[in-house]
From Swiss-Prot:
InterPro entries: Flavin_Rdtase-like_dom, NADH-dep_flavin_reductase, RutF, Split_barrel_FMN-bd. Catalyzes the reduction of FMN to FMNH2 which is used to reduce pyrimidine by RutA via the Rut pathway. Its EC number is 1.5.1.42. GO terms for molecular function: FMN binding; FMN reductase (NADH) activity; FMN reductase [NAD(P)H] activity; riboflavin reductase (NADPH) activity. One of its GO terms (biological process) is nitrogen utilization. It comes from the Bacteria. This is FMN reductase (NADH) RutF. Disulfide bonds: none annotated. It catalyses: FMNH2 + NAD(+) = FMN + NADH + 2 H(+). SUPFAM superfamilies: FMN-binding split barrel. The keyword NAD applies. It holds the Pfam family Flavin_Reduct.
Length: 166
């Protein structure tokens, strides 16, 4: 087994939230499914998003300089598949309801949370760009259950009925 395949297999065992990252601006509207998203700091609120420079959406995100990270809820598996494949952009966005945040990037109705961001710095790392994104607006939906990607499958999360014992 190659080192690359061993790494991919190991990473499949690292559970992660499923996100649809969207943008809209002078270069047009685009979106993709991502699990390579995480918090950097809360002062100021900053996320990082990893984007492959060979992805068809890369030039749009690069030119727009803004994005929204929409964390998917249980039940969004099909939508994740649309944004993770070769489906045309119009069909991707037609499959759900969207609103606009402060940057104008599409925010998914029913997302667990949406982080509307301005891209502040881009760091190239091998095949990807690491986008450091300043969070300008947060929209939460506390009535949803989470969705994670683990072992190459979706898993719905539910809230516990009671808190953890101390």
């Amino acid at each position: 087994m190659s080192e690359q395949q061993a790494f991919r297999d190991a990473m499949s065992r690292l559970g992660a939230a499923v996100n649809i990252v969207t943008t809209d601006g002078p270069a047009g509207m685009a979106g993709f499914t991502a699990s390579a998203v995480c918090s950097v700091t809360d002062s100021p609120p900053t996320l990082l998003v990893c984007l492959n420079r060979n992805a068809s959406v890369w030039p749009v995100f690069q030119a727009n300089g803004q994005l929204c990270v929409n964390t998917l809820a249980a039940g969004h598996e099909a939508l994740s598949g649309l944004f993770g494949g070769k489906t045309p952009m119009e069909e991707r966005f037609a499959a759900a309801r969207w609103r606009r945040g402060v940057t104008g990037s599409p925010q998914l109705d029913g997302a667990v949370v949406s982080f509307d961001c301005r891209v502040e710095q881009v760091v190239p790392v091998s095949t990807h760009d690491v986008l450091l994104c300043r969070v300008l607006e947060i929209t939460r939906n506390d009535d949803t259950h989470g969705l994670v990607w683990f072992d190459r499958h979706y898993h719905a999360l539910s809230r516990p009925v009671c808190g953890l014992a101390s």
